Amino acid sequence: DTFSSRGLGDVYKRQPGTGKKPNFWASGISVVMHMKNPNVPAMHFNTRYIFTSHGWFGGGMDVTPCLKDKNLEKWFHSELKKACNKHNKNYYSKYKKWCDRYFYLPHRNEPRGIGGIFFDYKKENWEKDFAFVREVGLCFKNIFREIILKKSKKKWTTKEKEIQYLKRGR
């Protein structure tokens, strides 16, 4: 496939490894969840591998609660840090900052949610990079499962549901 054949015009010129040829191959997993229960936060997860004349990994995850929960925020970031630290002690800090910048909403002067991690153009060592991306996926699965088990059966009020509608609808 090519970027231009996908209706992306000259976007390929900004992509590493395209040079004069807009050919690419891409594979990814993207999960976006907005639950009925306002106690369960919206969650986003994405991993990808893109190949032009060379390949790289990217991805991340973030959580956007409608209702404040400092315990969830602390636990979520602790789990992310543990997963990142298995591969590089600098990853969590680096990728959290990237996520904070990437998902900042300047028109609202606020972050999208409680943050997470975001990374792109990982191409140092294919085996190590793939192992990290796999770890991010497993971390998301475990975080999502734990949140669902803890919060999905929790009752909510009409006011909490209205907060959810407002948060999602703006």
Regions found by a protein language model. Give the residues of each.
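A short linear-motif detector with a strong N-terminal bias
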Residues: 3, 23-27, 41, 95-98, ...
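Single conserved hydrophobic/aromatic residue that forms the stacking wall/gate
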Residues: 1-12
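Long, contiguous internal "core" modules enriched in hydrophobic/ aromatic residues
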Residues: 55-157, 162
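Aromatic- and glycine-enriched beta-alpha-beta binding-site module
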Residues: 13-73
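A broad, low-specificity signal for short, low-complexity segments enriched in glycine/proline
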Residues: 10, 19-24, 134-139
